[in-house]
Every structure is written in C-alpha cells, then in structure tokens.
C-alpha cells in the first residue's frame, strides 16, 4: 500500500495514546494505522493520510497537547522499508489483515 505520510506521536501510557489518537482523528482527515508499545510505558501512535492532513493532525497535538508528548514527527512519502515496518506492526497487533505477497 502507498501512503502520502505517516504521523508519529509518542506518549507515556496507553490511555494517553488513545487520547492523542482521538485528537488527531478529530482534527484532520487521517486514519489510524497502528500503535507500538515500548519499555517504560511509552506508546507511539501512527496515523496516515495525505501530507497536509497528517501535518495538521500532528501539529494540533504539538500545539495543544492533551498530555505530555515525548516526540512527534511527520514522515512524508515514507520509504518502502518504513511502510513494511509499520504494516508488520499493524498486522502483529491485529489492526491490519495479513496479506499473502507470494505469487
């Protein structure tokens, strides 16, 4: 699948990840892709959409954070490897169905 951009926001705690996701989805025309949990309770939320929508969603969180934001970034035109990593994570967590790429 091809994505215009990825938006990544890292927070501490699953509840905060849900709140940040909700804010981004309500702010712009973006779609939730996956989330990634790390040591110490850090959660990174991934959204996708066109570059302007993803930028608006991430900027809204940075300008009016509902909680402490550890990191926020926009990756425009993500590489095939970045897409593969994000989609594998989404499949692992059940947010995306696995597809058979073998022919």
For the regions a language model picked out, list residue spans one by one.
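Helix N-cap motif at beta-to-alpha junctions
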Residues: 48-54
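Metallocofactor- and cofactor-centric catalytic cores in central/energy metabolism, strongly enriched
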Residues: 41-46, 72-82
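Short amphipathic alpha-helix segments
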Residues: 14-28
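Short, low-order "capping/linker" segments at domain edges
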Residues: 81-100
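RNA-recognition motif
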Residues: 34-40
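A common structural junction motif
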Residues: 28-31, 62-70
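Short glycine-/aliphatic-rich beta-strand segments at the starts of folded cytosolic domains
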Residues: 1-12
């Amino acid at each position: 699948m091809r994505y215009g951009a990825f938006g990544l926001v890292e927070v501490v705690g699953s509840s905060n990840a849900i709140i940040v996701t909700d804010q981004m989805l309500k702010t712009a025309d973006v779609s939730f892709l996956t989330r990634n949990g790390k040591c110490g309770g850090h959660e990174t939320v991934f959204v996708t959409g066109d570059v302007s929508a993803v930028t608006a969603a991430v900027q809204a969180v940075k300008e009016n954070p509902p909680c402490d934001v550890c990191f926020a970034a926009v990756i425009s035109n993500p590489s095939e490897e970045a897409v593969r990593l994000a989609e594998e994570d989404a499949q692992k967590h059940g947010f995306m169905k696995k597809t058979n790429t073998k022919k």
